[in-house]
């Protein structure tokens, strides 16, 4: 989208934020991530990047239903090194689009080993002076996608058009979230994991193939060494339901995000239990 000046862009952002009941900062962040994603889709690396995580979930269910601040991707066809990623992102930043935005790579660092997948974190800036928005892109490799990635049609925030990008299929998104919730048990401090499972299943559950989801979950737990959750999930869910800490974290989350305010912690637990009972029967 071309705008006359940065003030006009800010006005568009403010209106969209009011319409979707989320902060203008979140809308700006998502707009700039979208601008980066379009550059990836027009780059020679279009078929090497696979979109996953919060930004994909937001695209599936709607920005007013799930917001995120960063971009998660997995890459194929490349060895994951700082040098390779810097070169790739420098080229992506140099893709010219008529949207007034210029990107720059600020830094490259390793993702902590404690995260689900080790990988590389790319810090960037999206500039439309005087607007400057810091962005983070996480890049992993070797992710288990079952059965395979799909071509996802991504609708743009302000333009009446779409871009095409490779992405996780729905079953793999759900499998990773289920594994995270169950394997971390009461040690999980991220209410959004519960929300993601609940909202994805509520809005897209009918499109989810149960056999594929089970296989995706089995392969994810195999990769992460957490296969015990497949048999122990009833006991794990009992512990989760009885955790005062998790309930308080959920209550805080549902107060902070308008889209979660009418969903209870029990609702999310019931959804997880329903999915697990259905696929493990």
Name each region found by the language model.
Residues 56:
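Catalytic metal-binding/acid-base residues of hydrolase active sites
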């Amino acid at each position: 989208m071309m705008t006359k000046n940065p003030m006009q862009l800010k006005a568009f952002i403010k209106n969209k934020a009011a319409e979707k009941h989320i902060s203008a900062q979140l809308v700006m962040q998502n707009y700039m991530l979208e601008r980066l994603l379009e550059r990836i889709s027009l780059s020679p690396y279009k078929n090497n990047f696979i979109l996953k995580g919060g930004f994909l979930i937001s695209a599936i269910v709607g920005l007013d239903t799930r917001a995120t601040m960063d971009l998660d991707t997995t890459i194929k066809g490349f060895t994951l090194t700082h040098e390779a990623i810097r070169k790739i992102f420098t080229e992506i930043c140099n893709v010219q689009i008529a949207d007034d935005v210029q990107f720059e790579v600020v830094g490259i660092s390793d993702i902590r080993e404690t995260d689900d997948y080790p990988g590389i974190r790319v810090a960037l800036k999206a500039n439309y002076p005087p607007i400057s928005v810091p962005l983070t892109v996480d890049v992993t490799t070797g992710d288990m996608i079952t059965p395979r990635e799909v071509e996802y049609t991504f609708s743009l925030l302000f333009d009446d058009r779409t871009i095409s990008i490779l992405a996780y299929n729905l079953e793999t998104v759900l499998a990773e979230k289920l594994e995270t919730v169950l394997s971390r048990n009461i040690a999980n401090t991220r209410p959004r994991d519960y929300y993601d499972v609940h909202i994805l299943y509520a809005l897209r559950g009918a499109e989810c193939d149960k056999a594929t989801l089970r296989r995706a979950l089995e392969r994810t737990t195999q990769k992460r060494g957490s296969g015990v959750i497949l048999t122990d999930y009833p006991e794990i869910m009992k512990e989760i339901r009885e955790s005062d800490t998790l309930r308080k974290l959920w209550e805080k989350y549902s107060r902070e995000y308008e889209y979660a305010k009418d969903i209870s912690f029990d609702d999310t637990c019931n959804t997880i239990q329903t999915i697990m009972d259905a696929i493990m029967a």
